[in-house]
């Protein structure tokens, strides 16, 4: 797939009509969704890449791309893939006619490597420092539009934000004592959240954090928020309300839960059900290519 130009702000007249009541303000900078689909899932079925597994008649990666494609405020999408499934993902993207997917690129060995690769590509493409970058795990297929909108809005006040879901369980922080783990502290439950995605940043902020991290030989974070928290500790990271349904599909045991969520979504939206049937046909063809 050839790379297409990223959207840039269009000069607007000095006088503009007031937005309709309840309407979101017009974007003045690019809003770029980076969909990370490069993991191969060692805890999943090694012979069946989970990005291409069909849930509710639609490949997991397509659920995630759809969420950003259908958000009017997102201007561009970058998909980061494992080279082994690049052809299949390109086929799905091409057949579905996604208009916002600008480029599909190969990711790295680890999640942070894939993010770093995407940031390098965006810098080369000339993305402005104040662009809003939403980084999302492709294997969280049921992200809600409210979480995407909330992430975009949060970046008007902060330079970093993450979708998170309030923990309903007490969380224990532990330390090693001999061969066992023991409780070190118990944080107050109202202050504990389960990190989800998208994790969102102004481009200059996340780029600077990754530049600092790259110089650290002990750099081993598991997500992008951790990079900002560790390397730019003076930058507050806003919490955007997530949902229990925004689950990460990690093992085969997660599929039945995902199917139930998909069934509920499809039951609410007949148009989504029609799209899912089309996706199912394309996923079947892509699966045959993978074999």
Curated annotation (Swiss-Prot):
InterPro entries reported for this sequence: IspD, IspD/TarI, IspD/TarI_cytidylyltransf_bact, ISPD_synthase_CS, Nucleotide-diphossugar_trans
CDD domains given for it? CDP-ME_synthetase (cd02516)
- Annotated pathway, please? Isoprenoid biosynthesis; isopentenyl diphosphate biosynthesis via DXP pathway; isopentenyl diphosphate from 1-deoxy-D-xylulose 5-phosphate: step 2/6
EC nos = 2.7.7.60
Show the segment(s) annotated as Disordered: 1-23
Which top EC class is given?
transferase
| Gene Ontology molecular function | 2-C-methyl-D-erythritol 4-phosphate cytidylyltransferase activity
Determine if Repeat is one of this entry's keywords. no
Q: Which UniProt keywords apply?
A: Isoprene biosynthesis, Nucleotidyltransferase, Transferase
The GO annotation for biological process reads: isopentenyl diphosphate biosynthetic process, methylerythritol 4-phosphate pathway
Q: Where is this site: Positions MEP for the nucleophilic attack?
A: 189, 248
Q: Which reaction does it catalyse?
A: 2-C-methyl-D-erythritol 4-phosphate + CTP + H(+) = 4-CDP-2-C-methyl-D-erythritol + diphosphate
Q: Site (Transition state stabilizer): give the residues.
A: 43, 50
Does Transferase appear among the keywords? Answer: yes
Q: Known PANTHER family for this protein?
A: 2-C-METHYL-D-ERYTHRITOL 4-PHOSPHATE CYTIDYLYLTRANSFERASE, CHLOROPLASTIC (PTHR32125:SF4)
Q: What does this protein do?
A: Catalyzes the formation of 4-diphosphocytidyl-2-C-methyl-D-erythritol from CTP and 2-C-methyl-D-erythritol 4-phosphate (MEP).
Q: Give the similarity note.
A: Belongs to the IspD/TarI cytidylyltransferase family. IspD subfamily.
* Protein's name according to its UniProt entry: 2-C-methyl-D-erythritol 4-phosphate cytidylyltransferase
Native source species: Bifidobacterium longum (strain NCC 2705)
What lineage, starting at the top, does this entry show? Bacteria, Bacillati, Actinomycetota, Actinomycetes, Bifidobacteriales
* Originating gene: ispD
């Amino acid at each position: 797939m050839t790379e297409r130009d990223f959207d840039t702000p269009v000069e607007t007249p000095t006088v503009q009509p007031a937005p309709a009541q309840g309407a979101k303000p017009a974007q003045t900078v690019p809003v770029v969704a980076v969909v990370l689909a490069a993991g191969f899932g060692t805890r999943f079925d090694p012979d069946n890449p989970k990005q291409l597994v069909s849930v509710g008649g639609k490949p997991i990666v397509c659920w995630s791309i759809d969420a950003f494609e259908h958000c009017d405020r997102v201007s561009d999408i970058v998909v980061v893939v494992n080279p082994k499934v690049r052809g299949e993902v390109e086929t799905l993207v091409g057949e579905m006619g996604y208009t916002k997917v600008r480029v599909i690129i190969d990711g790295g060995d680890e999640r942070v490597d894939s993010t770093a690769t995407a940031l390098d590509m965006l810098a080369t493409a000339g993305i402005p420092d104040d662009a809003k970058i939403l980084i999302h795990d492709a294997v969280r297929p049921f992200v809600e539009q409210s979480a995407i909108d909330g992430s975009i809005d949060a970046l008007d006040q902060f330079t970093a934000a993450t979708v998170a879901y309030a923990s309903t369980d007490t969380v224990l922080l532990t330390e090693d004592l001999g061969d066992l783990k023991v409780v070190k502290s118990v944080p107050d439950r109202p202050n504990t959240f389960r990190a989800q995605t998208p994790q969102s940043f102004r481009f200059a902020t996340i780029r600077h954090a990754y530049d600092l991290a790259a110089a650290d030989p002990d750099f081993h974070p598991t997500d992008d928020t951790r990079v900002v928290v560790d390397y730019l500790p003076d930058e507050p990271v806003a919490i955007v309300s997530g949902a229990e349904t925004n689950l990460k599909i990690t093992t085969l045991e997660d599929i039945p839960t995902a199917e139930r969520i998909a069934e509920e979504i499809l039951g609410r939206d007949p148009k989504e059900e029609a799209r899912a049937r089309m996706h199912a046909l394309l996923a079947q063809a892509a699966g045959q290519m993978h074999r």
